[in-house]
């Protein structure tokens, strides 16, 4: 193992030298003793032919040379435009996760070991030649004994030790960067690598991907917007996934879509509707919607339907984050920057002690130039990216789900405008957001909220005692927590439920009915405020 680690280190060193990445390092504001190291590196003692490549291209080519784990890390980095300069992020977007297929006999052996059966006992046909191959898995076409056409996804054998080794080096580099550079510390490189570690290990569990696909399929069951292939659970294992084989047109194959007389405007608008439906209705969204994972069914070209595959990466938002995201977008398009700043503070995305006026001014400086464009040309993804970049300067906590959301939105926008250049994203999304916000305060939603709070009523006495005990102990030095992270919030919502119940009793002719309906109205209003306030 140590020998492998040393060989890997030498490989990394050769790539660093080949692409002059040490030049990029020494261009950073490092301490003097580290800058002096440039004279101690033997390969810098001799003249070197200059590379006619940008810094982003050099980094991209280096990651490609280092192999699939580094390629995937670069792909994830490319979505962190709140952290990276645009020229580097643009280059990393070009990274392609394409690697040669592994030996198909190994694939067969792994499938048989996972299923505990011979291939011929499960499939009437199994194509040895893979349909596709990537860094984590490869896919074979097959036909079940019961007659269904399927695809079989198989995890590459021996992948975990390779991933562990490469992650170890990424952590070493990240920790070194945090120790050596104040600028690097602001980017939290160790946190970035930790997020990647979770993502890559999640992708190794195909049962997780199968569960994600089943959930997404259930959310859009019978919908003309999106189709998700069926999972055949009887034949799914941690390293094997069997799904319905789909037939569609790649979403970027514009010529074929045009030949089928596809309604491109509707297709683009449906992409936006799918995104906002996933985020706001379901709070569960496919977070890897790049062109390779999206196809189109043109059985009805006037009503085209998207087909989504590869649900290995998904995201979700809390109800509070959904609410603040929607309100942020509305405030931004009204150019109410103070409201945007206040929402960031209220949500806990930036520290409570942030100076509102300074934060508002920073948001205005960054976002006002965006409105030089026509409204239809404004990118939601760019808006979120600019807001996150600004908030990072005010110590915004890393929000992994919001980063996934921004990446997904940028993908959807890019595809939508490729399909239909005149796509007006705000005009398409605004009615959906307005309807969602109205539904948040509808009687049905309020009653549902009340029901969930009533379930907590048995704990009301204990919660009241705990709250009074906490209030009796001074914590002046502690900054106030964001409202949606306070435990006391449950108590206040329960109090609201009690007010609603009391108001209903009075309105029905309770003990104070001789005073008229105004006490009941006040109690109901206070109850509603405590329950749905933001």
From Swiss-Prot:
Membrane topology type: Multi-pass membrane protein
Presence of the UniProt keyword Coiled coil in the record: no
Subcellular location: Cell inner membrane
InterPro entries linked: ABC1_dom, Kinase-like_dom_sf, UbiB, UbiB_bact, UbiB_kinase
GO cellular component: plasma membrane
Keyword Transferase included in the entry's annotation: yes
Main location: membrane
Pfam family, one: ABC1
Enzyme Commission number(s): 2.7.-.-
Location of the active site: 288 (proton acceptor)
Keywords: ATP-binding, Cell inner membrane, Cell membrane, Kinase, Membrane, Nucleotide-binding, Transferase, Transmembrane, Transmembrane helix, Ubiquinone biosynthesis
Pathway assigned to this chain's UniProt record: Cofactor biosynthesis; ubiquinone biosynthesis [regulation]
Disulfide bonds: none
Residues binding ATP, per UniProt: 131-139, 153
GO MF entries: ATP binding; protein kinase activity
UniProt-listed GO biological process terms: regulation of ubiquinone biosynthetic process; ubiquinone biosynthetic process
Bilayer-spanning residue ranges: 23-43, 490-510, 512-532
Limits of the Protein kinase domain: 125-492
Protein task: Is probably a protein kinase regulator of UbiI activity which is involved in aerobic coenzyme Q (ubiquinone) biosynthesis.
Stated family: Belongs to the ABC1 family. UbiB subfamily.
PANTHER family per UniProt: CHAPERONE-ACTIVITY OF BC1 COMPLEX CABC1 -RELATED (PTHR10566), PROTEIN ACTIVITY OF BC1 COMPLEX KINASE 7, CHLOROPLASTIC (PTHR10566:SF113)
Protein name per Swiss-Prot or TrEMBL: Probable protein kinase UbiB
Protein's organism: Pseudomonas fluorescens (strain ATCC BAA-477 / NRRL B-23932 / Pf-5)
């Amino acid at each position: 193992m140590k020998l492998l680690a040393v060989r890997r280190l030498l490989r990394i060193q050769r790539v660093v030298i080949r692409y002059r990445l040490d030049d990029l390092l020494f261009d950073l504001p490092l301490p003097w003793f580290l800058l002096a190291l440039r004279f101690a590196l033997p390969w810098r003692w001799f003249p070197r032919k200059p590379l006619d490549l940008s810094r982003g291209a050099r980094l991209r080519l280096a990651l490609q040379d280092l192999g699939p784990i580094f390629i995937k890390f670069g792909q994830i980095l490319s979505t962190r435009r709140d952290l990276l300069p645009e020229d580097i992020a643009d280059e990393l977007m070009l990274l392609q996760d394409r690697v040669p297929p592994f030996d198909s006999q190994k694939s067969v052996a792994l499938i048989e070991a996972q299923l505990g059966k011979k291939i011929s006992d499960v499939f009437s046909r199994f194509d040895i030649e893979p349909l596709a191959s990537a860094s984590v898995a490869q896919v074979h076409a097959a036909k079940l004994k019961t007659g269904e056409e399927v695809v079989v996804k198989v995890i590459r054998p021996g992948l975990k030790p390779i991933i562990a080794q490469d992650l170890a080096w990424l952590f070493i580099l990240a920790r070194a960067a945090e120790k050596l550079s104040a600028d690097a510390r602001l980017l939290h490189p160790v946190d970035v690598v930790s997020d990647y570690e979770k993502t890559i290990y999640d992708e190794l569990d195909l049962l997780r991907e199968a569960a994600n696909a089943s959930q997404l399929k259930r959310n859009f069951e019978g919908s003309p917007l999106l189709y998700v292939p069926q999972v055949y659970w009887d034949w799914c294992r941690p390293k094997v996934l069997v799904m319905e084989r789909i037939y569609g047109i790649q979403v970027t194959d514009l010529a074929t879509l045009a030949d089928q007389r596809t309604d491109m405007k509707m297709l683009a608008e449906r992409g936006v509707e799918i995104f906002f439906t996933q985020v706001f209705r379901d709070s569960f969204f496919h977070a890897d919607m790049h062109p390779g994972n999206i196809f189109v069914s043109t059985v009805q070209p006037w009503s085209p339907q998207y087909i989504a595959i590869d649900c290995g990466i998904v995201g979700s938002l809390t109800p509070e984050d959904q609410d603040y995201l929607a309100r942020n977008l509305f405030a931004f398009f009204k150019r109410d920057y103070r409201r945007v700043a206040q929402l960031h503070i209220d949500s806990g995305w930036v520290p409570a002690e942030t100076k509102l006026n300074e934060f508002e001014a920073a948001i205005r400086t960054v976002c006002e130039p965006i409105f030089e464009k026509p409204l239809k040309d404004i990118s939601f993804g760019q808006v979120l990216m600019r807001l996150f970049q600004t908030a990072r300067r005010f110590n915004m906590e890393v929000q992994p789900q919001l980063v996934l959301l921004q990446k997904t939105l940028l993908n959807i926008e890019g595809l939508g405008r490729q399909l239909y250049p005149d796509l007006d994203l705000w005009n398409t999304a605004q009615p959906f957001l307005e309807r969602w916000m109205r539904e948040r305060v509808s009687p049905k939603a309020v009653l549902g909220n009340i029901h969930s709070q009533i379930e907590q009523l048995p704990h009301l006495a204990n919660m009241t005692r705990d709250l009074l005990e906490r209030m009796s102990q001074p914590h002046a030095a502690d900054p106030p927590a964001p409202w949606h992270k306070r435990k006391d919030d449950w108590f206040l919502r329960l109090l609201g439920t009690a007010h609603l119940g009391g108001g209903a009793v009075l309105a029905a002719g309770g003990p104070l009915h001789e005073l008229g309906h105004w006490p009941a109205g006040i109690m109901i209003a206070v109850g509603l405020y405590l329950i749905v306030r933001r």
